[in-house]
Amino acid sequence: MKNIKKIIALVIAALMLAALASCNGTGTGTDNTTSPATGTADNTSKTYKVGICNYVDDASLNQIVANIKSQLEKIGTEKNVKFDIEYDNCNADKNVLSQIITNFVAEKVDLMVGVATPVATAMQAATAENKIPVVFSAVSDPMSVELVSSLEKPGANITGTSDFLNTDAIFDIMFAQNPDIKTVGLLYDVGQDSSATPIASAKAYLDKKGVAYKEYTGTTVDEVRLAAQSAVLDKVDAVFTPTDNTIMKSELSIYETFAQAKIPHYTGADSFALNGAFMGYGVDYANLGVETANMVADILINGKNPGDVPVMTFDNGTATVNTDICKELGLDYDAVAKTFAPFCTKVQPIQTAEEFEN
């Protein structure tokens, strides 16, 4: 009987020890689980999914995209976060654009970036209900296309960066270079919202100055090429194009037509000059991309409401002059730069190429 009692006592003691070990094990496990979880949150970066859509493959817009990506990568390293970027280009096709945005919504991106006005307006419409934040880039006149309520307080779920063009400044430069201009060709795509305001401003400027103008339009590269040839046949003295993506895409196909006819092409972006226009006047598109990325980070990392983030505009006083075209026009770059200087914050040279160097 005593042996049985001893056995029972030993069994009970063993069970009590097991219970104590179990309790202690649970407590230790909880501590270890919490600590690594906190450590994981601290040491492993949060990932934000960003959908970027470019409107068309041209030097200015490509430069914006490249700088958005590189700046987000830089911010990610500094802030210990990751940006999972989904990038696509609709190549000016509305159906493709719609599908790209639909895919972004289906993939549950945290934010969309629309490069150029048509992409931004399409994203605005697609996010009216789901309220996915949208940051636009290179939208010349966000007020006129009703992207924002005001530049200071955009409202809704959208904000961005604008490449607003000072059209009068371009014409001041044009007439400083050649006061004897009698007729100016206005080359643009009537379907580009970004061209509407600067073309209207150009007409008002020329009407006030008493200078004639003729309009030449095209929606494809072939149509733009024919329009350029028509301007040459009409013997215009100079040609103006705003920040028009259709003409930008066509510039490499038309610049020789103008240069051989000794007609200077004045445009609204440095990428035109890169692709063979005489002069491009406007914003620094590399910086535009950087600031667009900074906005994206401010919204995603800092929790800013897009509707409360003011639209960013820029000093657009940089004139980029193509030195190759200067020679073909019989002009001296140094003399041209001196003439342009009073109307610009900076005059810089460039040579004809397809893309900007990284």
Predicted features and spans:
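Bacterial signal peptide processing site
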Residues: N24-T26
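Beta-alpha junction/loop-to-helix N-cap segments that form part of ligand/metal-binding clefts
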Residues: E86-S149, D244-A259, I263-G268
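Hydrophobic alpha-helical segments within soluble ligand-binding/sensing domains
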Residues: D42-N43, D141-T183, V283-K304
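An alpha-beta-alpha
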Residues: V50, I68, T159-K209, N305, ...
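Pocket-lining segment of extracytoplasmic ligand-binding domains
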Residues: D193-H265, A269
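Extracytoplasmic "Venus flytrap"
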Residues: T44-S70, I75, E86-N95, G191-S195, ...
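C-terminal motif of bacterial Sec signal peptides marking the signal peptidase cleavage site
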Residues: A18-S22
